[in-house]
């Protein structure tokens, strides 16, 4: 009886630490096979590098920071992550939602993850220049929250992709499968130091 209990407990002891990817359609792999989305490629990279981490992708297409803030507690309880990648905000910007609300939501999510002893990476976004001053304030909000909450920061998820129309699906919003390795490389720059 005791041996059976020990055998059952062992996998929990050796389980990989978890990375929770908490984003919108840009991380959910909208319009492409799931295995091609950057969080799936992240899982493969971790395996190749023999890093003891698993990946839980809790991204939902269309999600705003308000929606993310509402569902983060349950996602944290379920995933028990060592690292949380917050990749939300693009839909707030595209809808022209108040920047203060987005900042407050990002800060609350970072704080909630930190209270669960998770390291946090905030992934920034940019808007097209035709959004005017709002676009500048929007982009600056990500860095401001990262500084305030002392999290890691990736400046722009679509860095190197946004200016290349051939790397977008027909809607001109969502990256193709071919763009996903570039998204992963961008995220990796901020994520890798958190895995040590």
Language model: regions and residue ranges:
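Flexible, glycine-rich phosphate/dinucleotide-binding loops
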Residues: 28, 64, 129
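Alpha-helical cap/lid subdomain in secreted, periplasmic
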Residues: 69-196
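Acidic/histidine-rich helix-loop elements
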Residues: 31, 56-65, 93-97, 172
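Residues at the start of alpha-helices and the adjacent loop-to-helix junctions
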Residues: 7, 19-21, 60, 105, ...
């Amino acid at each position: 009886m005791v041996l059976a209990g020990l055998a059952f407990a062992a996998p929990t002891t050796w389980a990989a630490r978890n990375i929770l990817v908490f984003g919108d359609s840009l991380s959910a792999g909208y319009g492409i096979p799931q295995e091609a989305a950057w969080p799936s490629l992240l899982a493969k990279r971790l395996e190749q590098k023999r890093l003891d981490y698993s990946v839980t992708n809790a991204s939902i297409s269309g999600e705003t920071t308000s929606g993310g803030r509402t569902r983060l507690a349950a996602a944290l309880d379920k995933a028990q992550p060592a690292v949380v990648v917050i990749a939300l905000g693009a839909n707030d910007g595209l809808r022209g939602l108040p920047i203060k609300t987005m900042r407050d939501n990002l800060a609350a999510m970072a704080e909630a993850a930190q209270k669960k002893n998770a390291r946090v990476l905030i992934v920034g976004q940019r808007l097209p220049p035709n959004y005017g001053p709002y676009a500048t304030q929007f982009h600056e909000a990500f860095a401001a929250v990262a500084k305030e909450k002392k999290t890691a920061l990736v400046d722009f998820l679509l860095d190197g992709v946004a200016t290349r129309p051939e790397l977008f699906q027909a809607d001109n919003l969502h990256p193709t499968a071919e763009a996903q390795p570039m998204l992963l490389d961008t995220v990796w720059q901020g994520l890798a130091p958190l895995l040590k």
